[in-house]
Regions:
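A conserved short coil-to-beta-strand element within the FAD-binding core of flavoproteins
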Residues: 103-116
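N-terminal Rossmann-like FAD-binding beta1-loop-alpha1 element of flavoenzymes
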Residues: 2-31, 174-192
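Phosphate-coordination loops involved in phosphoryl transfer and adenosine-cofactor binding
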Residues: 3-5, 104, 169-171
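Glycine-rich dinucleotide-binding loop and its adjacent helix/turn
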Residues: 83, 136-193
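Helical element adjacent to the flavin cofactor pocket in flavoenzyme catalytic cores
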Residues: 85-102, 139-142
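Glycine-rich active-site loop/strand segments that organize a redox cofactor
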Residues: 32-86, 199
């Protein structure tokens, strides 16, 4: 049985930020999850972050985007808005600078016992933690309308499922939604040669 003061469940940007802050505060941290998996696997290559480079993951203000740009020899002016590839590189740079140890494994169960938490991993191992911080990300929270299932499979996709647009070259596409991901995916569909895109 493994132990930790704080178990961070998830390995995305907010998990990294919280774990770094906790470690900086002297807390023994374990991070479990697939490192930046949603961002690497569910985001299209041409996507830009809605946020500019004036924010960062570091509560201490040390490993900021500015520090990353300087270290990489990049210009802030050339990278605003921030491309997804640059964001992924920043998160890896941040993780390395903060020496965050991410265990690439998934949780299968969590129970409370005797004032602690017992996390069971998919491989059957357990971690006992005094505190747990859940940072599962948005992958599991796709909002699908009730009529979604009525549209034949292969003719519908949530934005989190559609990361390659080549198959829609020349197609007519309806994007249902009115927030950032709807407009971003509409623009990406146009960039990849969709005949028509209606939002």
């Amino acid at each position: 049985m493994e132990k930790a003061d704080l178990l961070v469940i998830g390995a995305g940007p907010y998990a990294y930020a919280a774990a770094a802050f906790a470690e900086q505060s002297g807390i023994d941290v374990r991070i479990v999850g697939r490192p930046m998996a949603f961002w690497r696997e569910q985001m299209p290559a041409g996507m830009f972050l809605r946020s500019g480079s004036d924010w960062h993951l570091d509560a201490a203000g040390e490993h900021t985007f500015e520090a990353y740009f300087e270290d990489r020899g990049l210009s802030r002016a050339d990278l605003d808005p921030i491309p997804i590839a640059v964001f992924l590189d920043y998160t890896e740079w941040f993780r390395e600078r903060k020496a965050l140890r991410v265990e690439d494994r998934l949780l299968s169960g969590l129970a409370k016992a005797d004032g602690t938490f017992v996390a069971t991993m998919e491989d059957g191992s357990t971690i006992v933690a005094d505190k747990v911080l859940a940072a599962p990300g948005i992958r599991h929270f796709a909002n699908l309308p009730t009529w979604y299932e009525a549209v034949p499979s292969g003719r519908r996709a949530h934005t989190s499922e559609l990361v390659s647009f080549e198959e829609l070259t020349g197609a007519r596409v309806v994007v249902v939604g009115g927030r950032q991901s709807a407009y971003e995916w509409a623009a990406l569909l146009c960039d990849h040669g969709a005949e028509r895109v209606d939002v």
